[in-house]
């Protein structure tokens, strides 16, 4: 028995370890579970308005003509836990009756209207501003003003209509910049809860059940704003003809982990379900979702399959060799090749003929029977162009194209492939939606020009609104995580700091505390492999040893990448070293932190990297960024993002980036920013390997070995290589001394 515990059991004394344990238990981490409220921005006034709207809708639906007092009495009966058995049974009967009435109302088609509970413009403005949602019409001002004039003409009496129309024709007003911004602003009806999708927007019953089964109750900011727009919100129908429901083209900029995938999947699935009911004979690919990486595309398919269960909609991941269109010339060319082979081999028997027909049938894959196709750009372009050997085939049935991580897809790396896919979708009513956490003005301009180009080519006069929705501040990191910018001076200092994260020695107020699982990002694939081999034995065998750490990059095969992702999601892998392959879109909900071992190539990459933690409003995530002496010219953009994120959070306390540091860091020119985005920090570029005596490359090497040890290893490797070369060289021809004539010819004169 511990005497100290016995004597101090009535006191509040705690040992250092116990205090540290209790502090760790009270701190909330992303891995402990989902947040009660997934929203990042909200205040009491907006919550009150949403709660009033929700209660009003519930009373209208539940009452069916009954007064509100009766419903309140029923609620009180349900919540009276200390009543008698008779009263409790009565309350249970009333509750059962109410549930039956609600179920019958749902069965009748959810006829309970929500029109009476709609917010006016002032309330909508209050809610949207509180959640930091800004909705803007990006069309030309002439189109916006003409549409608003048409709306006013239908709403006003006939006498006033003629006078105002004449006045508008006679005196065209030139708007100031402030008035132009005001004219472009829209205030759509916000989504109160996911139940409204069924009661108000009439989505498929089975789709609504699948959403409820996934546990979605409170919509996030991006869902609160975009779902009504895509499902036909009447409050913004001034952007189209009066009385007509029009789905707009969308540009959405929302923080990482805010539920963008669900926001574009629900309207697309519901639209296809309706199309199946209206035209059951027409089948094909009705929607294309484009993502930059295979991991993100696979994740979208997994989320989509949960939503399409029982709806009759099929979602498919694009793979190499899949046929998405049927070409007329393919079958003829195949038959011609087979005939040529038969004529060349005229003496073959019947077995050879059977093998030829089998090869013919097996060689051509069947056309994919899918409603939603999720793909990376190159795979679909190769499928549409037969590996660039034929003109690009058309996808005439596609009515929705979704670009997830649109700023990357419209970057020079993927731009031509993405635009080829966009142009191949030839349906006149094609709607495009672009989604990302970071989107520059160049992406917006490219999207507007592409939409206008499609309109000019098709010759349609019908105009669709182009709406931009921004949540929070553009190009800013999520405010619910803690950012740390750590100066490590050298590569060895970064490695030492990373090992201190893995094995903390002491707890102080300034220390960074990071618990697994977490991600480590590097600049290049060789650096990721080197860091993985360096940390391979840092985890003790009692905790799983080297099996707890893995490396993931694009040079691995698809099966290896999927196995590593599966192990990380299941919790078998605690630390994952990777490149920017996993920086975008991939949803790991339980990640406690992110370590930027190498600084990101741009501010946008930093936003996406640190967005792997703090998903769906989870608190407690940590983002640690190490920088060395070589990184000082490139750090200011990251420091600015951290400063803006902390201001957005509004919480007091010590700042991660002090003002003196922001003032002292140098600014980066546009040319240097472009070079950094394209190649990264010069000292860590992989092409420096070819320069053997490069001092920068030696200093940037990830290793704890001394220079003497590395020199001895290189000497040993060189000796082994020289020995192999000597053995592989052919032996020299024998000379006259070794000719084999053993007879002695005497002494020469």
Curated annotation (Swiss-Prot):
List of residues binding ATP: 254-261
EC numbers for this chain: 3.6.4.13
Primary localization class, coarse: nucleus
Ranges of compositional bias, category Acidic residues: 69-78, 111-120, 331-355
Compartment list: Nucleus, Nucleolus
Nucleotide-binding as UniProt keyword: yes
Uppermost EC category: hydrolase
Low complexity biased stretches: 17-28
InterPro entries reported in the protein's UniProt record: DDX52/Rok1_DEADc (IPR044764), DEAD/DEAH_box_helicase_dom (IPR011545), DEAD_box_RNA_helicase (IPR050079), Helicase_ATP-bd (IPR014001), Helicase_C-like (IPR001650), P-loop_NTPase (IPR027417)
Keyword ATP-binding belongs to the record: yes
Domain Helicase ATP-binding: 241-457
GO molecular function annotations of the record: ATP binding; ATP hydrolysis activity; RNA binding; RNA helicase activity
Short sequence motif named DEAD box, residue ranges: 404-407
Entry keywords, A to Z: ATP-binding, Helicase, Hydrolase, Nucleotide-binding, Nucleus, Ribosome biogenesis, RNA-binding, rRNA processing
Quaternary structure, from the entry: Interacts with the U3 snoRNA and is associated with the 90S and 40S pre-ribosomes.
Entry domain remark: The Q motif is unique to and characteristic of the DEAD box family of RNA helicases and controls ATP binding and hydrolysis.
Task performed by this protein: ATP-dependent RNA helicase involved in 40S ribosomal subunit biogenesis. Required for the processing and cleavage of 35S pre-rRNA at sites A0, A1, and A2, leading to mature 18S rRNA.
UniProt similarity note: Belongs to the DEAD box helicase family. DDX52/ROK1 subfamily.
Protein's UniProt name: ATP-dependent RNA helicase rok1
UniProt organism field: Aspergillus terreus (strain NIH 2624 / FGSC A1156)
């Amino acid at each position: 028995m511990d005497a100290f515990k016995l004597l101090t059991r009535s006191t509040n004394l705690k040992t250092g370890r116990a205090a540290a344990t209790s502090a760790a238990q009270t701190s909330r981490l992303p891995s402990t579970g989902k947040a009660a409220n997934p929203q990042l921005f909200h205040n009491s006034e907006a919550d009150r308005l949403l709660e009033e709207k929700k209660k009003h809708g519930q009373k209208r639906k539940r009452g069916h003509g009954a007064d509100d007092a009766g419903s309140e009495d029923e609620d009180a009966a349900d919540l009276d836990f200390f009543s008698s058995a008779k009263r409790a049974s009565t309350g249970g009967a009333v509750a059962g009756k109410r549930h039956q009435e609600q179920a019958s109302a749902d069965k009748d088609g959810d006829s309970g209207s929500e029109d009476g509970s709609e917010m006016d413009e002032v309330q909508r403005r209050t809610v949207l501003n509180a959640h930091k949602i800004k909705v803007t019409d990006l069309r030309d001002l002439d189109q916006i003003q003409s549409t608003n004039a048409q709306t006013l003409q239908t709403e006003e009496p006939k006498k006033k209509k003629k006078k105002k129309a004449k006045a508008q024709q006679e005196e065209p007003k030139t708007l100031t910049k402030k008035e132009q911004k005001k004219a472009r602003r829209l205030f759509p009806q916000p989504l109160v809860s996911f139940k409204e999708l069924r009661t108000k927007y009439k989505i498929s019953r089975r789709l609504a059940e699948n959403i409820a089964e996934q546990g979605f109750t409170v919509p996030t900011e991006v869902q609160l704003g975009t779902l009504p727009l895509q499902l036909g919100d009447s409050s913004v129908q001034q952007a189209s003809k009066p009385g007509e429901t029009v789905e707009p083209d969308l540009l959405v900029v929302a923080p990482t982990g805010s539920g963008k995938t669900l926001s574009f999947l629900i309207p697309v699935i519901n639209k296809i379900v309706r199309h199946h009911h209206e035209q059951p004979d027409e089948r094909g690919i009705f929607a294309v979702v484009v993502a930059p990486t295979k991991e993100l595309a696979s994740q979208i398919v997994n989320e989509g399959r949960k939503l399409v269960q029982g709806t009759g909609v099929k979602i498919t991941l694009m793979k190499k060799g899949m046929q998405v269109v049927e070409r007329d010339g393919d079958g003829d060319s195949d038959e011609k090749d087979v005939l040529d082979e038969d004529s060349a081999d005229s003496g073959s028997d019947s077995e050879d003929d059977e093998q030829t027909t089998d090869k013919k049938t097996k060689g051509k894959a069947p056309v994919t029977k899918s409603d939603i196709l999720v793909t990376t750009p190159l795979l679909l372009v190769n499928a549409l162009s037969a590996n660039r050997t034929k003109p690009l085939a058309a996808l005439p049935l596609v009515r929705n194209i979704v670009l997830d991580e649109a700023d990357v897809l419209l970057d020079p790396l993927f731009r031509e492939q993405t635009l080829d896919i966009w142009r191949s979708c030839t349906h006149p009513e094609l709607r495009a939606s672009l989604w990302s956490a970071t989107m520059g003005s160049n992406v917006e301009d490219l999207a507007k020009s592409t939409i206008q180009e499609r309109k000019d080519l098709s010759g349609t006069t019908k105009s669709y609104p182009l709406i931009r929705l921004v949540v929070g501040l553009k190009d800013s990191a999520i405010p619910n995580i803690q950012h740390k910018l750590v100066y490590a001076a050298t590569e060895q200092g970064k490695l030492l700091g990373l090992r201190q994260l893995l094995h903390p020695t002491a707890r102080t107020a300034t220390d960074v505390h990071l618990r697994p699982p977490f991600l480590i990002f590097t600049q290049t694939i060789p650096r990721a492999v080197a860091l993985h081999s360096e940390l391979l034995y840092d985890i003790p065998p009692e905790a799983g040893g080297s099996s707890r750490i893995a490396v993931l990059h694009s040079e691995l095969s698809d099966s290896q990448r999927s196995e590593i992702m599966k192990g990380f999601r299941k919790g078998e892998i605690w630390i994952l070293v990777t490149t920017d392959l996993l920086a975008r879109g991939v949803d790991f909900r339980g990640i406690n932190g992110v370590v930027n071992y190498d600084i990101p190539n741009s501010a946008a990459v930093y936003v996406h990297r640190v967005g792997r933690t703090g998903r769906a409003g989870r608190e407690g995530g940590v983002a640690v960024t190490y920088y060395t002496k070589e990184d000082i010219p490139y750090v200011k953009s990251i420091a600015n993002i951290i400063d803006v994120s902390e201001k957005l959070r509004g919480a007091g306390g010590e700042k991660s980036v002090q003002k003196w540091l922001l003032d002292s860091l140098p600014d980066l020119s546009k040319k240097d920013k472009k070079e950094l985005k394209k190649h990264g920090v010069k000292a860590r570029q992989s092409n420096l390997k070819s320069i053997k005596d490069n001092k920068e490359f030696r200093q940037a090497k990830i290793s704890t070995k001394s220079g003497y040890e590395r020199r001895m290893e290189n000497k040993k490797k060189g000796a082994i290589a020289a020995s192999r070369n000597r053995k592989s060289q052919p032996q020299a021809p024998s000379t006259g001394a070794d000719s084999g004539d053993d007879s002695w010819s005497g002494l020469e004169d």
